């Protein structure tokens, strides 16, 4: 085995894995979107050259119904989905939006617009859209003693 990826690993989990592994993970797939942004985890992954892959970048569709996100998307003349995807990309993560139609998949690729720093900082501070798809607390490596 030469390459591994992990899913839903928190900082403690990754620290212990990195301390004990021979093969470092190249990707950590986590829930990451406006309203649920674990910046310490994203920063830890960046510092350790672990790519963050964001599943559900539009909050399982909840973000599409949020008036504040809709209004901010209008400012950039994009859909709320595009704004959400762009937000994740500007954090340095890869976005994996779910889409059931070819039209939406094509639309989701067109996210080449700049989001200003002030808007991005406001979005980082939002703490809603949680509790609907959380993976919960399930220690993988974090609570175990290091070898």
Regions found by a protein language model. Give the residues of each.
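Beta/alpha (TIM)-barrel catalytic core signal, keyed to glycine-rich beta->alpha loops juxtaposed to Asp/Glu
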Residues: 1-147
